[in-house]
């Protein structure tokens, strides 16, 4: 099932991209978990 594989890839990218962008920016102030 190619569609299922594509769906899984989308989920993985969706969860991994925030960590990748956070690592590339290397800015703890932009962490959405610490708005206060």
UniProtKB/Swiss-Prot annotation:
Keywords attached to this entry: Membrane, Photosynthesis, Photosystem II, Plastid, Reaction center, Transmembrane, Transmembrane helix
Chief subcellular location: plastid
Membrane topology: Single-pass membrane protein
UniProt cross-references to InterPro entries, sorted A to Z: PSII_PsbI, PSII_PsbI_sf
GO cellular component, one term: photosystem II reaction center
Stretches that traverse the bilayer: 4-24
The keyword Iron is annotated on this UniProt entry: no
Keyword 4Fe-4S: no
Compartmental location: Plastid membrane
Top-rank lineage group of the source organism: Eukaryota
Annotated family: Belongs to the PsbI family.
PANTHER family reported in the protein's UniProt record: PHOTOSYSTEM II REACTION CENTER PROTEIN I
Role summary: One of the components of the core complex of photosystem II (PSII), required for its stability and/or assembly. PSII is a light-driven water:plastoquinone oxidoreductase that uses light energy to abstract electrons from H(2)O, generating O(2) and a proton gradient subsequently used for ATP formation. It consists of a core antenna complex that captures photons, and an electron transfer chain that converts photonic excitation into a charge separation.
Assembly and interaction partners: PSII is composed of 1 copy each of membrane proteins PsbA, PsbB, PsbC, PsbD, PsbE, PsbF, PsbH, PsbI, PsbJ, PsbK, PsbL, PsbM, PsbT, PsbX, PsbY, PsbZ, Psb30/Ycf12, at least 3 peripheral proteins of the oxygen-evolving complex and a large number of cofactors. It forms dimeric complexes.
The protein's name: Photosystem II reaction center protein I
Native source species: Aneura mirabilis (Parasitic liverwort)
Phylogenetic classification of the source organism: Eukaryota, Viridiplantae, Streptophyta, Embryophyta, Marchantiophyta
The encoding gene: psbI
